[in-house]
A protein has these predicted regions:
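Histidine-centered phosphotransfer motif of kinases
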Residues: 44-62
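Conserved beta-strand-loop-beta-strand hairpin that lines the nucleotide-binding pocket
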Residues: 1-15, 57-144
């Protein structure tokens, strides 16, 4: 006999682990596109997720040979939350943390470098960074 789920049951979170190579950022984006189908803010969420996955590959041990990064997402109560977990390491893009964009883009970086978290800060309702052991999770939330 199947148990009845309450009407307000939240959908489960989705997640996947990717090899730490630049080409895998596109695969992470494709994965999330399927999860976020129907979310009006899906394009913004995909852009932000791409920026975080790129940072994981470029600025953490995830980008080294054999490295990996994970992408998790959940859509609940009109809000999407996306997390990108990397293998830690030096944190170079501008010193941003916990929703404060700091000096990103003004710290001597040129060209396209260092702008990813500024984009996340502009598009997301909230974002932050959590360090846990030798791993780091950067997350954002966007209202759908």
């Amino acid at each position: 006999m199947a148990a009845d789920l309450p009407a307000a049951a939240a959908p489960p979170a989705s997640g996947r682990v990717f090899p730490g190579a630049a080409v895998q950022v596109r695969e992470a984006r494709r994965f999330l596109a399927g999860v976020l189908d129907g979310c009006p803010a899906g394009d913004d969420a995909l852009l932000c997720a791409s920026e975080l996955a790129t940072n994981a590959v470029l600025y953490s041990r995830s980008g080294r040979p054999g490295g990996r990064f994970a992408v998790r997402s959940a859509v609940r109560a009109g809000r999407v939350r996306v997390e990108v977990e990397d293998e830690g390491g030096p944190w170079r893009p501008g010193g941003e943390q916990n929703g404060q964009n700091g000096q990103n883009g003004q710290n001597g970086q040129s060209g396209q470098s260092g702008r990813g978290l500024v984009i996340v800060g502009q598009r997301a309702s909230r974002w932050g960074r959590d360090d846990h052991g030798d791993r780091r999770t950067v997350w954002f939330e966007i209202d759908c």
